[in-house]
Swiss-Prot record:
Keywords: Cytoplasm, Schiff base, Thiamine biosynthesis, Transferase. Homotetramer. Forms heterodimers with either ThiH or ThiS. It comes from Escherichia coli (strain K12). GO terms for cellular component: 2-iminoacetate synthase complex; cytosol. Its EC number is 2.8.1.10. This is Thiazole synthase. It catalyses: [ThiS sulfur-carrier protein]-C-terminal-Gly-aminoethanethioate + 2-iminoacetate + 1-deoxy-D-xylulose 5-phosphate = [ThiS sulfur-carrier protein]-C-terminal Gly-Gly + 2-[(2R,5Z)-2-carboxy-4-methylthiazol-5(2H)-ylidene]ethyl phosphate + 2 H2O + H(+). GO terms for molecular function: thiazole synthase activity. 1-deoxy-D-xylulose 5-phosphate binds at G156, A182, G183, N204, T205. Its main location: cytoplasm. The active site is at K95. It comes from the Bacteria.
Length: 256
């Protein structure tokens, strides 16, 4: 069971809504993933219409919606988008994204921290997408963010946990949930994130662009479950030396 702010989730896999070939395929994949928290970009939906092609099936599916501020380049733009989302969707939950460079889509640490502090004061449950910077993640936690969402690699790159060393520090020092977001390309990446101590992962591109998004979503669900179970089972420690699993000389001594 994963708890973030006032909500609990059975699934440790969060999903996105972008890049799917159709809304129907998107919903089928989300259901197959078992995800209970789904993020959506405000710029992709008509907030005035609950029968929007993306919004309506998500509401019908009964998932928790996590609007994001993707496309915002400054703290001010993100705060404005957050208030639009709260008014239209009736939720205080927000994935804070501020990335001014459209080529790399890397989060702006200064603007993100600035916006997070203001939004928390205004009553939002803020989950900030951020770089894998342990100092920044701690600062975001200190200003009241409900979780932190450091990247594994650039958005949509499918490179995996390229920031693993920093993620390990973030996880070790965090007192709020850590959700690895961005760059996760295959289910094994998700399993590794859970094994190393992450509380959840957010996956979008890897599922949406797969030849079979529904089966890929199932694969991610199983990988997250396996990674969490492995961590809870207490993996053995790594060693520089070999350690035999069977006696090496006993049978020789017995036959002598």
């Amino acid at each position: 069971m994963l708890r973030i702010a006032d909500k609990t989730f059975d699934s440790h896999l969060f999903t996105g809504t972008g890049k799917f070939a159709s809304s129907q395929l998107m919903v089928e994949a989300i259901r197959a993933s078992g995800s209970q928290l789904v993020t959506l970009a405000m710029k992709r939906v008509d907030l005035r219409q609950h029968n929007d092609a993306i919004l309506e099936p998500l509401i019908a599916a009964g998932v928790t919606l996590l609007p994001n501020t993707s496309g915002a380049k400054t703290a001010e733009e993100a705060i404005f988008a957050a208030h639009l989302a709260r008014e239209a969707l009736g939720t205080n939950w927000l994935k804070l994204e501020i990335h001014p460079d459209a080529r790399w889509l890397l989060p702006d640490p200064i603007e993100t921290l600035k916006a997070a502090e203001t939004l928390v004061q205004q009553g939002f449950v803020v989950l900030p997408y951020c770089g894998a910077d342990p100092v920044l993640c701690k600062r975001l936690e200190e200003v009241g963010c409900a979780a932190v969402m450091p990247l594994g690699a650039p958005i949509g790159s499918n490179q995996g946990l390229e920031t693993r060393a920093m993620l390990e520090i973030i996880i070790q020092q965090a007192t709020v949930p850590v959700v690895v977001d961005a760059g996760i390309g295959v289910p094994s990446h998700a399993a590794q994130a859970l094994e190393m101590g992450a509380d959840a992962v957010l996956v979008n591109t890897a599922i949406a662009v797969a030849d079979d998004p529904v089966n890929m979503a199932k694969a991610f669900r199983l990988a997250v479950e396996a990674g969490l179970l492995a961590r809870q089972s207490g993996p053995g420690s790594r060693s520089y030396f070999a350690h035999a699993t069977s006696p090496l000389t006993g049978f020789l001594e017995a036959s002598a």
